[in-house]
Amino acid sequence: MSAFDDAIAAPVEKDTVADLRVLDSKKRGAEARAADEVAKAVLLGRFRHNPGLGWLEWEGRRWDGGEVATDRVHETVRQFVDEVERNYRAEVAEQAATGALIVDEIEQQVPKERRTKDDGKPMKPGDVVQAFGTKEQKAAFDKAADAAQAANTQAEIWLNLLTAGHVASVAKLCRGMDGILTRAAEFDAHPDLLNCRNGVVDLRTGQLQPHDPELLITKLAGAAYDPTARSQLWDQALSAVHPDALEWFQIRMGQSITGHTPDDDAIVVSVGGGENGKTGVTVGIMRACGTYGRLISHRILIAHPGQHPTELMDLRGLRFALMEETPEEGRLNTHQLKMTIGTPQITARKMRHDDITFDTTHTLLVNTNHQPIVDATDHGTWRRLKALPWPYTFLPPGVTPTKENERVGDRTLKPRLDTDEGVAAAALAWLVNGAVKWYAAGRISPADPAPVVEATALWRRVSDVGLRFAQENLIADPDRYITADVLRAQFNATLEAQGKHTWSAQTINERFSASLLAAGIPVKGTPKKPTKILDHHRESQPDPEPPPNGVPRPSSVRHLDSPAAAEKTAAKKTARVWMGVRFLTRAEKRQRDADPDRTLHAVAGE
């Protein structure tokens, strides 16, 4: 009882919290038992944990994660353990004070000389009570002593937990508890909602509702939502968009802030040289999106041999994904295009981590001065690409516009778009309005306006060498055909003249049908398998090149409708040919070049 005797004279230290948490007196399982108490007292409702995302903290508007959240969990655990330990120390002091009062009562009734031991030293408080106290006083004193001893034991146990290692262990044990452990799929699982600084917007209606931790939203837009917000700077930025494409662009960008992928699996590629205003518009959109938007690496879509696929992880949970300035001569990775656009889930991994699979939520906008090269000819690739031209060039101050597409520029616009408080709010209102329109149309994007159709067709014609060859050299004709060898020879000769790699027979057989179809030539047979040659079918071959200076020269390409060649092919009855197509004659090419708007029609027997 000597420890209690020593504590009787100590002052009582009161703490703001009187809560006491009892752990095993033998210190067995102290961390696990402490974790239960910590989770219930200070973590539930404030913190969540997911193995892939780590700790997240509710900050009043969203669940915020990262290393800071982990540090805050550890500090919260440390403060709680420290507070409980100090409460037990205060309990020891309070019980000691109770014992001191009992001793004082006895000492007032017993003379000092009687409270002295044989060796002349004063008796200890406990000995005084046992020697002179009443039955009631002894019972009260023993009760206080037992309580103090128990509190002191608990204080020692909790004090032992006040090390970095124990605090981290307690926090780790809390991660798997109900109400804290959360599946990744539960976060940001409301694609129709947008978390703004003043509440949560239902993008289907534009209505605002209060923030709610039960929604488990981790993202936050860059402004408060006000449907009436306007900004002269934002209106000035939007004036750079082609007027015939402005509403289309608004609805497209409105769809991009939802958690739904584009209904047509498309990406918008903003095309145009420098000083055309597209960067200013995307600055406003990115500011409005806040953490819902992100600038992503062009390596996601531009082929780089041997690259590590970690960039795809940037798309996890993202809504508006912006890719700025693809490299000149960059070649579009069509495989990754199909992996990232129009697929319900994406599999990726962080460096030195295992693969994970997550739902696709993003919409991609590409800003580029140089259109990526697209080697693919298939419809599946080109249906995903929409080129948005930015028609104007904004000139430096003092330079007078001389062309129809030139405008007087404002060099202060972009920095002001980047800093003005009203721009983010106005851009957010514009985006939400576009989203509401998209939902009102049944979540169907509007038809592409003429500028987009024309720019995309031009891009495809430039990129698709097969399409360009077909448009310049071929025409549909149901009764004509071109043998596989002849078409390959002519096509590869064209590629060689352009300094491009030639195609193998297999590549032509696999890809040229899509080019023909895009050129409006729906062939009825391809060299993939033999086609039956009927009596009325006639072989087509290119016109021979005119001899230089009238001097004939040999040619490895057979002349148009060579009787011997036609008879040889017809005798086979089946052959590997392109059926339903023929070469344009030189006369037809001259006619087309003289009147580009006139449509050429194939005439049987021509």
Segments (PLM) and residue ranges:
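Compact, glycine/acidic-enriched structural inserts
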Residues: 87-94
